[in-house]
Amino acid sequence: LSEKLTLKQKQDEEYPKIIRSDSILFACTGTIGEKFPLEKIKNSLPNLVDNIKYNQNKLIWMKAASGIKTTDTKPKLAMSECKIGNTPIKVYGIAKGSGMIFPNMATTLGFIFTDANLSSSILKNILKDTIETTFNAISCDGDTSTNDMVSIFATNKANNSEIKSHKEKKLHD
């Protein structure tokens, strides 16, 4: 196993994947009155791309959740495993936000990831059906902000059976 993992890492380093610019998502809640640091981000991109690793360890989700904190005191993350049919599926979520949280999210950013094989339209409908009783139900201090976002992504790496509707029973069992 050790030799296989070492070989895989070497292959990833020798044949890096190309990341298209339209595959990068930026999210920011910002501080009222402060200009978005576009130049700082633009100048940091080459270093970020050079340091991407394709074989991350289990701590990657903690690192990601910690990386998006602003005034949060702790990283916010969750992980769950379930099945679509007989296929095991993983779902991970990370979020940031500690103040100015009121229904409709305010300064909360949430990112949900799954390895399930689901189309973007299925993901969109799942998120739409669940957002009102989850993220949009959060209240911290009664203040709202103009910056909010929850996104859902599927890598489609799982080999689950095709899902044709977000209402399918096998998604809810």
Which functions belong to the PLM regions below?
Residues E3-K10, E14-F135:
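Glycine-rich, mobile lid/loop segments that gate access to catalytic sites or pores
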Residues T130-A137, M149-K157:
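Membrane-embedded hairpin module used as a gating/binding unit in multi-pass transport
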Residues V150, T155-D173:
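A glycine- and small/hydrophobic-rich beta-loop-beta segment
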